[in-house]
């Protein structure tokens, strides 16, 4: 039985900081971001199913979200202004991501490869699944902006404005629900969110 470096690589996602060109009150790494995106994507899928007659596999959505940035362990987290500087750079970076995704999949033992390929290779998910993960990814970036702004860091003002436009372009009923029900709390203090739930 041969050894695989797959999970040793994924473990290093915690060493890759997001928002590298911006001053952060608290740094965020790709590993913790992936967990938050998985939780939010799962919630969006559950909301879609329960409230808006959707029929998506919420658990699969959570897993897709958990692995959505896995290739960054090989590529690093390219800052958004660089990644989308022009269409040629965006296209080339997509090609690099695809190569990195395949390299990760190839690290998995052959008898398990199809399971992980279905989670890491973004071309193996449906458009509906992809959109839910993209919504969750943008929502989590937006929540990071709210947290930084609430801590007095105006460095995130323009990012918040840009992400509001992104969220508007990806708008859905489940996202509207999430924004109305869950997002306002991110601008409150610990005391404020704990008032109604004493231990």
From Swiss-Prot:
Residues 30-142 form the HD domain. Belongs to the 5DNU family. Catalyzes the strictly specific dephosphorylation of 2'-deoxyribonucleoside 5'-monophosphates. A divalent metal cation binds at residues 33, 68-69, 137. Homodimer. The keyword Flavoprotein does not apply. It is found in: Cytoplasm. This is 5'-deoxynucleotidase Ent638_2835. One of its GO terms (cellular component) is cytoplasm. Its main location: cytoplasm. Its EC number is 3.1.3.89. PANTHER family: 5'-DEOXYNUCLEOTIDASE HDDC2. It comes from the Bacteria. Keywords: Cytoplasm, Hydrolase, Metal-binding, Nucleotide-binding. One of its GO terms (molecular function) is metal ion binding. It catalyses: a 2'-deoxyribonucleoside 5'-phosphate + H2O = a 2'-deoxyribonucleoside + phosphate. The record marks 18 as: Appears to be important in orienting the phosphate for catalysis. NCBIfam families: PRK03826.1. Substrate binds at residues 18-19, 33, 69, 77-80, 137.
